[in-house]
């Protein structure tokens, strides 16, 4: 599915780091990212270390890192790489980039801001405080961010303009409050979905479904992908008050897998656990898995 001539993420990151003027910073970033197998994530203590060592703010560091984040993009349709970095309440940085899939419908696409935010969500961040992106967020992403539990205070940084509130880009916004929904994306969930299993992949998918954000349809859905080396990556459904900017569970999981420096070609198994109240993501999930390499889907319906 990759569009890049430099296929491995390490090659793309090395090329991006070569463009950073501060060579010592570039070398430090190369070492840190290599040590963590090119996971697109910097814990708070690493962010603080870089800021202190190189006398910069975390906002300045995030702007420098945007080309590195964009290395994780798979722009197979647009040939246009977008990078984003979500800063969590913890102080950690979560990279994100656009993920596109040919030969299926364009609604399967993951935007860079969705990528960074869902990456943070899967790493159990509690709140997003800032997001840095190399291009102005599109309307789809503005609406997606409006679902966050930090929407009212979320700050957006662009190369040409920093410290703007989300609602500067989305005035008079329609959101969860219009539908009398108080629980937001990143708030804790308690769906109490239950299924007896000793299979760790099924349990991971069940846990992802129990974490899903679906206050409008009540279709709680989660997926787990197992790689050939037995690593497991979860994805939870992130629903949106405007419906169409919702992020399906498979996209969340694929994005998490890719942002951890892995390849979709290494997926061996997939399990979707779902309470299909008004919707179902089974068909859409099977369609995309077929494109990715005829990966069979185990589907488990719970209540």
Swiss-Prot record:
Active-site residues, record numbering mapped to chain: 113 (proton donor)
Binding-site positions, Zn(2+): 111, 138, 141
Key words, A-Z: Hydrolase, Metal-binding, Zinc
Cellular component GO terms held in the UniProt record: cytosol
Domain of life: Bacteria
Keyword Hydrolase included in the entry's annotation: yes
Protein name: Cytidine deaminase
Organism the protein comes from: Histophilus somni (strain 129Pt) (Haemophilus somnus)
